[in-house]
Amino acid sequence: MAGFISNFFGVGDSDSQYEEPTEASQAAAPTESATNTRSTPKVVPMQGGKSVNSKIALFEPKIYSDVKEIATQLLKNQAVIINFDHVDDEMARRIVDFLTGTVFAINGEIERIGDEIFLCIPENYEVSGSTTSQFDTSKL
């Protein structure tokens, strides 16, 4: 019984059972380990929720029908800056009213960033900071 336990733990007389490795088995061993180290990596690139190619479109509308192109850009999830220098105040109000509805429909925001300049952003944009200057409210 003691011999069995010694053999089980590798302490006993096991010289007779040991075989010298042959050259063929030694040559085969490195190729197996080489193939194991060449396994393909399991790396998966992570895709972010926000697009890296975000764009901001600039518009200076001259007539009311220009609002259609501005709204199309917003529906494509692009931010828009609108400069109302080239339209009268009544036309600018109509365009801002239309864009307010468009921005509401896409869960975006519209912000006044200058006397006659507005920023419209879709839902996936965030604006930080604020303007400290007082705007002339009689213009729009």
Swiss-Prot record:
Chain ranges passing through the membrane: none
GO biological process, one term: FtsZ-dependent cytokinesis
Renumbered residue ranges of the record's region Disordered: 15-47
Compartment(s) where it occurs, according to its Swiss-Prot or TrEMBL record: Cytoplasm
Keywords: Cell cycle, Cell division, Cytoplasm, Septation
Pfam families recorded: SepF
One cellular component term from this protein's GO annotations in UniProt: cytoplasm
UniProt keyword annotation of Cell division present: yes
Chief localisation class: cytoplasm
Record flagged with keyword Methyltransferase: no
HAMAP family per UniProt: SepF
Subunit structure: Homodimer. Interacts with FtsZ.
Family: Belongs to the SepF family.
Function, in words: Cell division protein that is part of the divisome complex and is recruited early to the Z-ring. Probably stimulates Z-ring formation, perhaps through the cross-linking of FtsZ protofilaments. Its function overlaps with FtsA.
Protein name in the entry: Cell division protein SepF
Organism of origin: Lactiplantibacillus plantarum (strain ATCC BAA-793 / NCIMB 8826 / WCFS1)
